[in-house]
Amino acid sequence: VAVIGAGAAGLAAAKALAAQRIPFVLLEASHRIGGRAHTEYPPDGAPFDLGCHWMHSASINPFVPIADEYSVRYEKRDDYGPEARYFRGGEWVSELALESLAEESETAEVAIAAAWSEGIDSSVAEVTERDGEWTSVLDYYTTLDTSVDPDEVSIGDVVSYEDTDENWPVVDGYGQLVERWGSGVSVSLNTAVRAIHWGDTGVRLETTQ
């Protein structure tokens, strides 16, 4: 079995295959494992996450017990901290004006749920307003949550996401957590997959190695 990418999903797949004693190769284009989970350490030594940082839906997030197992510190919090403020057209956006953002967000959620209930598997961009007052802001949050643009996110992924409103930051760094957890997995680093050929005779991968 070939697993492409040594992010959290790829590492989990490799661990599952190893547990079943199924031969596999794990191919990673980068020089490290972890994908978007990447922690760096500035001169002051404090961990700084360049990618993901929060364990969302903490009570059902499998990385919470993993963090406990590897003694990686995290903080149990009730919220994200100070609320975001928006600056537009040279001035701060008022709370009253932000009501339209909440309304547009709710409209998008309803449109996504309605399309999915009809058996339509489209991208977020295809079923939501593209010229709304807050489209760019909502697109920003979609990308922030999924790491891809709205035209690449399936509405099925959005609907299936279970949000418990428990969001805990990883104090020692999410990248460090994933790195520790995946350190025992055999992986071929600096091995980018350039092409996948899938036919009657099987699957063939072209890599840089």
Features from the language model and the residues they span:
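FAD-dinucleotide binding site
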Residues: 1-209
